[in-house]
């Protein structure tokens, strides 16, 4: 048995993107320090797939923001309709980023949980298109910003630790994202500005 059972792989943003694109049916949980690009990776995934993007700020969601019960008088049942912001009502693939999932309220996280099922993931009563990409973001425990994840969630996802970009990686990203040339030159001159407390 491996001695590294409890260690998570550490990747850069490009590696995380490539893993997600190569395995769209797996729910990845990207953890890293604040500001490393976990959330903005959603735009890269949207560009790569051409799918619509649904950015969900989980800490600001309440139960009524996820789905609502609707009465079906004809069949004498209730149906659960998800919020249109998730984009799954179109029946087309979508990129869904459950941003800061680990800071959401427990009832909200539990309500989002059916999205992580291996067979027929859904939200409310609607199934998510099989080509859709869903991923979660959160911070490291050492950041001390209130992240928590239940064990039954951990069993359904793959955790990746996303490290901060180095200056070469950041400059390649900045070049394609409209960042000021002055700021790019400064980062090129002072690459230590991207150093992390984890580096020491």
Q: Where are the regions that the model predicts?
A:
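C-terminal regulatory/interaction module of P-loop NTP-utilizing enzymes
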Residues: 1-200
């Amino acid at each position: 048995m491996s001695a590294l059972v409890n260690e998570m792989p550490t990747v850069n943003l490009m590696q995380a993107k490539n893993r997600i694109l190569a395995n769209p049916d797996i729910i990845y949980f990207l953890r890293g320090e604040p500001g490393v690009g976990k959330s903005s990776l959603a735009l890269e995934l949207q560009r790569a797939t051409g799918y619509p993007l649904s950015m969900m700020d989980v800490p600001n969601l309440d139960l009524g923001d996820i789905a609502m019960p609707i009465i079906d008088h004809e069949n004498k049942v209730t149906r659960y309709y998800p919020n249109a912001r998730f984009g799954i009502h179109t029946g087309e693939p979508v990129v869904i980023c459950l941003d800061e999932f680990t800071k959401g309220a427990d009832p909200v996280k539990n309500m989002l949980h059916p999205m992580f099922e291996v067979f027929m993931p859904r939200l409310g009563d609607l199934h998510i298109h099989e080509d859709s990409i869903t991923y979660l973001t959160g911070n490291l425990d050492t950041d001390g910003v209130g992240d928590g994840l239940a064990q039954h969630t951990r069993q359904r996802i793959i955790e990746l630790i996303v490290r901060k970009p180095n200056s070469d990686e950041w400059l390649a990203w900045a070049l394609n994202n409209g960042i000021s040339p002055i700021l790019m030159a400064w980062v090129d001159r002072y690459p230590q500005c991207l150093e992390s407390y984890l580096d020491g």
